[in-house]
Amino acid sequence: MPVHVETHANISDAARALSSARDGRFFGGGTLLMRALNEADQSIGTIVRCTDPVLRQVRSEGDRIAIGAGVTMAEIMANRDLAFLAPVARIIGGPAVRSAATVGGNLFAEPPYGDFTTALLALDASVRFAGESGQSTPLQDFLRDRANRRGRVVESVMVPRITDPKALRFVKVTRVKPKGAALMSIAAWLPGSGGRGCRIAYGNMAPTPVRAAAAERALEGASLSEQGIARALQAATEGLTPPTDMFASEWYRREVAPVHLKRLLLGQGQ
Protein backbone atom coordinates (compact mmCIF):
# COMPACT_ATOMS: atom_id res chain seq x y z
CA MET A 1 0.00 0.00 0.00
CA PRO A 2 1.47 3.41 -0.97
CA VAL A 3 2.17 5.85 1.85
CA HIS A 4 1.41 9.55 1.40
CA VAL A 5 3.90 11.99 2.98
CA GLU A 6 2.99 15.59 3.87
CA THR A 7 5.42 18.23 5.12
CA HIS A 8 4.19 21.40 6.81
CA ALA A 9 6.14 24.46 7.92
CA ASN A 10 3.59 25.43 10.57
CA ILE A 11 2.60 23.24 13.51
CA SER A 12 -1.05 24.31 13.28
CA ASP A 13 -1.21 23.13 9.65
CA ALA A 14 0.46 19.85 10.61
CA ALA A 15 -2.05 19.34 13.42
CA ARG A 16 -4.98 19.87 11.04
CA ALA A 17 -3.49 17.47 8.50
CA LEU A 18 -2.94 14.77 11.10
CA SER A 19 -6.43 15.12 12.60
CA SER A 20 -8.01 14.68 9.17
CA ALA A 21 -5.99 11.57 8.25
CA ARG A 22 -7.56 8.51 9.85
CA ASP A 23 -4.52 6.43 8.89
CA GLY A 24 -2.03 9.19 9.71
CA ARG A 25 1.08 9.13 11.88
CA PHE A 26 3.25 12.06 12.87
CA PHE A 27 6.91 11.74 11.95
CA GLY A 28 9.27 12.82 14.73
CA GLY A 29 12.62 11.05 14.70
CA GLY A 30 11.30 7.99 12.93
CA THR A 31 13.18 5.45 15.05
CA LEU A 32 10.02 3.40 15.62
CA LEU A 33 7.80 4.68 12.82
CA MET A 34 10.26 3.73 10.08
CA ARG A 35 10.56 0.26 11.55
CA ALA A 36 6.79 -0.10 11.34
CA LEU A 37 6.82 1.06 7.72
CA ASN A 38 9.64 -1.32 6.85
CA GLU A 39 7.57 -4.12 8.35
CA ALA A 40 4.64 -3.09 6.11
CA ASP A 41 2.29 -1.89 8.85
CA GLN A 42 -1.00 -1.64 6.94
CA SER A 43 -2.52 0.78 9.45
CA ILE A 44 -0.27 3.62 8.26
CA GLY A 45 -1.32 5.40 5.08
CA THR A 46 -0.23 8.99 5.72
CA ILE A 47 2.87 10.46 7.33
CA VAL A 48 2.79 14.06 8.50
CA ARG A 49 6.05 15.94 9.00
CA CYS A 50 6.55 19.43 10.44
CA THR A 51 9.56 21.76 10.22
CA ASP A 52 8.22 24.40 12.62
CA PRO A 53 11.15 25.57 14.84
CA VAL A 54 8.88 25.55 17.92
CA LEU A 55 9.24 21.77 18.01
CA ARG A 56 12.99 22.04 18.58
CA GLN A 57 12.96 24.71 21.27
CA VAL A 58 13.83 24.39 24.96
CA ARG A 59 12.61 27.41 26.89
CA SER A 60 11.98 28.51 30.47
CA GLU A 61 8.43 29.16 31.66
CA GLY A 62 8.61 30.26 35.27
CA ASP A 63 9.59 27.33 37.47
CA ARG A 64 9.14 24.87 34.60
CA ILE A 65 10.93 24.09 31.36
CA ALA A 66 9.14 23.51 28.06
CA ILE A 67 10.89 20.89 25.94
CA GLY A 68 9.81 20.86 22.31
CA ALA A 69 8.46 17.53 21.12
CA GLY A 70 11.08 17.44 18.36
CA VAL A 71 14.05 17.80 20.72
CA THR A 72 16.27 14.73 20.41
CA MET A 73 17.91 12.66 23.13
CA ALA A 74 21.32 13.95 21.98
CA GLU A 75 20.08 17.53 22.39
CA ILE A 76 18.78 16.74 25.87
CA MET A 77 22.27 15.51 26.81
CA ALA A 78 23.86 18.71 25.49
CA ASN A 79 21.50 21.16 27.23
CA ARG A 80 22.81 22.50 30.54
CA ASP A 81 19.32 23.30 31.86
CA LEU A 82 18.31 19.66 31.31
CA ALA A 83 21.31 18.07 33.01
CA PHE A 84 19.00 16.14 35.35
CA LEU A 85 17.54 14.31 32.32
CA ALA A 86 20.86 13.64 30.58
CA PRO A 87 21.50 10.25 32.31
CA VAL A 88 18.09 9.05 31.14
CA ALA A 89 18.60 10.24 27.55
CA ARG A 90 22.01 8.56 27.51
CA ILE A 91 20.52 5.06 27.84
CA ILE A 92 18.20 5.49 24.83
CA GLY A 93 19.85 3.30 22.20
CA GLY A 94 23.22 4.18 20.69
CA PRO A 95 24.52 7.47 19.25
CA ALA A 96 22.63 7.10 15.96
CA VAL A 97 19.33 6.49 17.75
CA ARG A 98 19.88 9.32 20.23
CA SER A 99 20.54 11.76 17.38
CA ALA A 100 17.12 10.97 15.91
CA ALA A 101 14.83 9.82 18.75
CA THR A 102 12.62 12.65 20.02
CA VAL A 103 10.91 13.49 23.27
CA GLY A 104 7.50 13.51 21.56
CA GLY A 105 8.09 10.17 19.87
CA ASN A 106 9.05 8.54 23.15
CA LEU A 107 5.65 9.49 24.58
CA PHE A 108 4.03 7.05 22.15
CA ALA A 109 6.64 4.28 22.37
CA GLU A 110 5.21 0.89 23.25
CA PRO A 111 7.00 -1.54 25.61
CA PRO A 112 9.87 -2.42 25.78
CA TYR A 113 10.59 1.22 24.86
CA GLY A 114 9.48 4.47 26.50
CA ASP A 115 12.16 4.76 29.20
CA PHE A 116 12.38 8.54 28.84
CA THR A 117 8.62 8.84 29.35
CA THR A 118 8.98 6.86 32.59
CA ALA A 119 11.31 9.56 33.91
CA LEU A 120 8.94 12.29 32.74
CA LEU A 121 6.09 10.62 34.61
CA ALA A 122 8.10 10.60 37.83
CA LEU A 123 8.76 14.32 37.29
CA ASP A 124 5.02 15.11 37.15
CA ALA A 125 5.43 16.32 33.56
CA SER A 126 2.57 17.61 31.44
CA VAL A 127 1.93 17.54 27.70
CA ARG A 128 1.00 20.50 25.54
CA PHE A 129 -0.73 19.88 22.23
CA ALA A 130 -0.55 22.15 19.19
CA GLY A 131 -3.19 24.87 19.32
CA GLU A 132 -3.91 24.66 23.07
CA SER A 133 -2.63 28.19 23.84
CA GLY A 134 -0.65 27.39 26.96
CA GLN A 135 -2.94 24.70 28.37
CA SER A 136 -1.40 21.35 29.20
CA THR A 137 -2.50 17.83 30.08
CA PRO A 138 -0.91 15.92 32.99
CA LEU A 139 1.27 13.16 31.56
CA GLN A 140 -0.51 10.58 33.70
CA ASP A 141 -3.82 11.50 32.04
CA PHE A 142 -2.19 11.53 28.61
CA LEU A 143 -0.88 7.99 29.08
CA ARG A 144 -4.24 6.74 30.32
CA ASP A 145 -5.78 7.64 26.96
CA ARG A 146 -2.66 7.49 24.78
CA ALA A 147 -4.15 5.31 22.04
CA ASN A 148 -6.75 7.97 21.29
CA ARG A 149 -4.23 10.80 21.06
CA ARG A 150 -2.31 9.68 17.97
CA GLY A 151 -4.37 12.06 15.89
CA ARG A 152 -3.01 15.10 17.75
CA VAL A 153 0.37 16.80 17.48
CA VAL A 154 2.33 17.18 20.71
CA GLU A 155 4.03 20.59 20.76
CA SER A 156 6.04 20.29 23.98
CA VAL A 157 6.47 18.60 27.33
CA MET A 158 6.59 20.65 30.54
CA VAL A 159 8.90 19.55 33.36
CA PRO A 160 9.87 21.21 36.65
CA ARG A 161 13.19 23.04 36.79
CA ILE A 162 15.54 20.90 38.88
CA THR A 163 18.82 22.35 40.11
CA ASP A 164 20.00 19.19 41.87
CA PRO A 165 20.48 16.39 39.30
CA LYS A 166 20.55 13.83 42.14
CA ALA A 167 16.89 14.57 42.90
CA LEU A 168 15.96 12.44 39.88
CA ARG A 169 17.15 8.86 40.06
CA PHE A 170 16.75 6.39 37.23
CA VAL A 171 17.69 2.80 36.48
CA LYS A 172 17.21 0.71 33.36
CA VAL A 173 17.13 -3.03 33.99
CA THR A 174 18.27 -4.93 30.90
CA ARG A 175 19.89 -8.24 30.11
CA VAL A 176 22.08 -6.72 27.39
CA LYS A 177 24.11 -3.69 28.45
CA PRO A 178 24.30 -0.90 27.60
CA LYS A 179 21.81 -0.78 24.71
CA GLY A 180 19.49 -3.72 25.33
CA ALA A 181 15.73 -3.28 25.59
CA ALA A 182 14.59 -2.71 29.16
CA LEU A 183 12.69 -5.45 30.94
CA MET A 184 11.98 -2.76 33.52
CA SER A 185 12.89 0.84 34.20
CA ILE A 186 12.37 2.77 37.42
CA ALA A 187 12.46 6.51 38.00
CA ALA A 188 12.21 8.26 41.36
CA TRP A 189 11.93 12.00 41.93
CA LEU A 190 12.89 13.04 45.46
CA PRO A 191 12.06 16.76 45.69
CA GLY A 192 12.00 17.00 49.50
CA SER A 193 13.97 15.68 52.41
CA GLY A 194 13.69 11.95 52.96
CA GLY A 195 10.75 10.46 51.12
CA ARG A 196 8.50 13.53 51.37
CA GLY A 197 6.78 14.19 48.04
CA CYS A 198 8.56 11.28 46.36
CA ARG A 199 7.19 10.15 43.00
CA ILE A 200 8.05 6.71 41.62
CA ALA A 201 7.32 5.49 38.08
CA TYR A 202 7.86 2.15 36.36
CA GLY A 203 8.37 1.39 32.71
CA ASN A 204 7.49 -1.99 31.16
CA MET A 205 5.40 -2.95 34.17
CA ALA A 206 2.13 -2.11 32.37
CA PRO A 207 1.05 -1.18 28.81
CA THR A 208 2.30 2.36 29.49
CA PRO A 209 4.63 3.85 32.13
CA VAL A 210 2.80 3.83 35.45
CA ARG A 211 3.11 5.34 38.93
CA ALA A 212 3.93 3.12 41.90
CA ALA A 213 1.30 4.77 44.08
CA ALA A 214 1.43 2.29 46.96
CA ALA A 215 5.20 2.58 47.27
CA GLU A 216 4.92 6.37 47.20
CA ARG A 217 2.42 6.38 50.05
CA ALA A 218 4.60 4.03 52.12
CA LEU A 219 7.59 6.28 51.59
CA GLU A 220 5.89 9.54 52.58
CA GLY A 221 7.61 10.96 55.65
CA ALA A 222 10.09 8.08 55.87
CA SER A 223 13.86 8.39 55.85
CA LEU A 224 15.86 7.14 52.89
CA SER A 225 17.51 4.41 54.92
CA GLU A 226 17.12 0.64 54.76
CA GLN A 227 14.70 0.74 57.67
CA GLY A 228 12.84 3.78 56.34
CA ILE A 229 12.16 2.34 52.89
CA ALA A 230 11.22 -1.18 54.05
CA ARG A 231 7.45 -0.60 53.77
CA ALA A 232 7.84 0.97 50.34
CA LEU A 233 9.72 -2.09 49.10
CA GLN A 234 6.97 -4.38 50.37
CA ALA A 235 4.50 -2.31 48.37
CA ALA A 236 6.77 -2.01 45.31
CA THR A 237 4.36 -3.76 42.93
CA GLU A 238 1.11 -3.41 44.86
CA GLY A 239 -1.78 -2.65 42.53
CA LEU A 240 0.25 -3.48 39.41
CA THR A 241 -0.06 -6.39 36.98
CA PRO A 242 3.33 -6.72 35.29
CA PRO A 243 3.30 -8.41 31.88
CA THR A 244 4.84 -11.69 30.85
CA ASP A 245 6.67 -11.29 27.56
CA MET A 246 9.83 -12.34 25.72
CA PHE A 247 12.00 -10.37 28.16
CA ALA A 248 10.68 -11.55 31.52
CA SER A 249 7.75 -13.14 33.31
CA GLU A 250 5.32 -11.40 35.63
CA TRP A 251 6.80 -13.40 38.52
CA TYR A 252 10.34 -12.28 37.71
CA ARG A 253 9.36 -8.63 37.43
CA ARG A 254 7.62 -8.77 40.80
CA GLU A 255 10.69 -10.38 42.36
CA VAL A 256 13.31 -7.97 41.03
CA ALA A 257 11.35 -4.70 41.27
CA PRO A 258 11.92 -4.29 45.05
CA VAL A 259 15.62 -5.11 44.61
CA HIS A 260 16.19 -2.38 42.03
CA LEU A 261 13.90 0.09 43.81
CA LYS A 262 15.92 -0.38 46.99
CA ARG A 263 19.19 0.36 45.21
CA LEU A 264 17.65 3.39 43.56
CA LEU A 265 16.25 4.91 46.76
CA LEU A 266 19.49 4.30 48.65
CA GLY A 267 21.49 5.86 45.84
CA GLN A 268 23.52 2.71 45.27
CA GLY A 269 25.27 2.70 41.92
CA GLN A 270 23.98 6.17 41.00
Residues covered by each model-derived region:
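C-terminal structural segment of proteins
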Residues: 1-270
